[in-house]
Swiss-Prot record:
Keywords: Cell membrane, Lipoprotein, Membrane, Palmitate, Signal, Sugar transport, Transport. This is Polygalacturonan/rhamnogalacturonan-binding protein YtcQ. It is a lipid-anchor. The gene is ytcQ. Transmembrane segments: none annotated. It is found in: Cell membrane. A lipid is attached at residue 23 (N-palmitoyl cysteine). Belongs to the bacterial solute-binding protein 1 family. Disruption phenotype: Deletion of the gene has a negative impact in the utilization of polygalacturonan and rhamnogalacturonan type I. Its main location: membrane. The complex is probably composed of two ATP-binding proteins (MsmX), two transmembrane proteins (YtcP and YteP) and a solute-binding protein (YtcQ). It comes from the Bacteria. Residues 1-22 form the signal peptide.
Length: 498
């Protein structure tokens, strides 16, 4: 990154909060937070930069034109976003729009609770797109039952299975629909020469050292395991204290013991996991369904045929999949720089506007004919020659998007189309975390430390280093080391939120 950008990014902690331009429209439009035809709204914005360079001005200028705004965006590199945010909160120098990714950061929680940011729950009903925001995700980003920002939407669940369809066909196997059938496919992929090369060189599942985004948590949801926490009558139980968690460990242990998955998965990276699949050694991948595109693109066998599965029946015959919070933080509005209700309404009107098809399409797909090609029936394609410009001009703008409207479907890639359709279908079977919107100070301070106790015990059990009773001892250690306090704090927060 050049010196110019370094200097620009360092100034985040300086004041960026100019007062919004006055409205020249009628009193009616002012009350509704809508700018008059001749009044440009000036907005200062702290945004997160997930790419090497900020987007070029061309797209920004188009957004300003469509929304009648002047955008003063400070791009903060992803690696330093928390430090810069904490410094800005401490100094009290904040722009009008603040991107907050970790809403349970202790500094952020204190800022919300102290009244530093506007509470917008009573306002969004006046804006048609904001009023249609997903109610579950809105609940997930509340703090003490209050909504302090517009969520940055992400899919609630992208988890599923990528499987070698050509291997299924070679062995005359049907697509698995239950956990038992999935196990039998893993066995056949290991023992029955699915690639028909006459060699004993394949196995079923390729997994990695990730109990969340690898296979474990998704298989757990198929088993009926709760998503992080189980709530019953106001009492909270962590997932690893349930029988379904042990059933998941036993399922994975059985796969490993019989050689139907890579034995070294606790020390396998995601790159290594994907290489095992792409190089034709494994035929089952469990994780983010969009990874199917990358697995295919890096395949050593270009004739590889893949299928994506999102529904697997558990022992009780039900289909489930675990859900994330459905967000990547919020856009929040500090009272120090958004001084009046009228100014807040102007900003809310802006976010409502960028959810409309013309602005959203510009920020997501780019300029028709330059970054993509719009087809009929709400579809689009992107040529290889258009990808680079889209990546540099448009992709960084995803950091500015709140509501994911997905007006167009990409028909240029059947695998990506399948991923999008199945991700949408997942919303019908998701299992949410009942503690998602709750706050525990002990969890915030010591959660990662305590989680390591359980993670280590889980891996050790699955590879046969400890017994079930020894695993239970580690759970007791978690409780005595602070886990009981976390449970109590969640139960109290749940009671207060009702």
């Amino acid at each position: 990154m050049g010196n110019k950008w370094r200097v620009l990014l360092i100034v985040l902690v300086l004041a960026l909060g100019g007062v919004l331009a006055g409205c020249k429209g009628t009193d009616q439009s002012s009350a509704e937070g809508k700018a008059g035809p001749d009044s440009k709204v000036k907005l200062s914005w702290m945004a997160i930069l997930y790419h090497q360079q900020p987007p070029k001005d061309r797209a920004i200028k188009e957004i300003e034109k469509l929304t009648n705004t002047e955008l003063d965006i400070t791009w903060v590199p992803d690696a330093v976003k928390e430090d810069r945010l904490n410094a800005a909160l401490a100094a009290g120098n904040l722009p009008q729009i603040v991107t907050i990714q970790d809403i349970k950061n202790s500094s952020v929680m204190n800022a919300f609770r102290s009244g530093m940011f506007w509470e917008i729950g009573d306002y969004i009903k006046d804006y048609p797109n904001l009023n249609k925001m997903n109610k579950l995700i809105n609940k997930n980003v509340t703090i003490d039952g209050k909504l302090y920002g517009i969520y940055r939407e992400r899919p609630l669940s992208r988890q599923g299975i990528v499987i070698r369809k050509d291997w299924l066909d070679n062995l005359n196997l049907k697509t698995p629909k239950t956990l038992d059938e999935l196990y039998e496919v893993a066995k056949a992929f290991t023992e029955d020469d699915p690639d028909k090369d006459g060699k004993d060189d394949t196995f079923g599942l390729a997994d990695r050292n990730d109990l969340i985004y690898g296979a474990f948590k998704t298989i757990g949801s198929y088993e009926g395991m709760p998503t992080d926490w189980k709530e019953s009558g106001g009492k909270f139980t962590p997932d690893f204290m349930t029988q379904e968690y042990k059933d998941t460990m036993n399922y994975m242990k059985k796969l490993r013991d019989n050689g139907y998955m890579n034995k070294d998965f606790p020390v396998t990276s995601k790159t290594q996991q994907q290489e095992l699949f792409s190089q034709g050694k494994a035929g089952i991948y469990i994780g983010n369904m969009v990874d199917a595109v990358n697995l295919r693109d890096h395949a050593s066998d270009k004739s590889m045929k893949l299928e994506i599965i999102n529904r697997i029946k558990g022992p009780d015959g039900k289909e489930r999949v675990w859900a994330s919070g459905g967000h990547n933080g919020v856009f929040a509005f500090p009272k120090t720089s958004v001084k009046t209700e009228a100014e807040l309404k102007r900003i809310l009107a802006f976010f409502d506007r960028i959810a409309e098809e013309d602005v959203y399409s510009l920020m997501t797909y780019g300029i028709d004919g330059v970054h993509y090609n719009k087809g009929e029936d709400k579809t689009f394609t992107r040529k290889e020659s258009q990808v680079k410009d889209w990546q540099t001009d448009i992709q960084p703008l995803s950091a500015l998007i709140a509501i994911d409207k997905a007006y167009l479907k990409n028909t240029g890639d059947p695998l990506r189309t399948a991923y999008e359709e199945l991700t949408e279908d997942n919303e019908k079977i998701i299992v949410s975390n009942p503690a998602e919107s709750l706050y525990s100070a002990s969890e915030s301070e010591r959660g990662d430390e305590l989680k390591k106790i359980i993670d280590d015990a889980t891996y050790k059990y699955m590879i046969g280093d400890i017994t079930e009773s020894q695993f239970d001892k580690e759970v007791e250690k978690w409780e005595s080391s602070g886990g009981k306090q976390i449970i109590q704090e969640y139960e109290e927060a749940f009671k207060q939120a009702k």
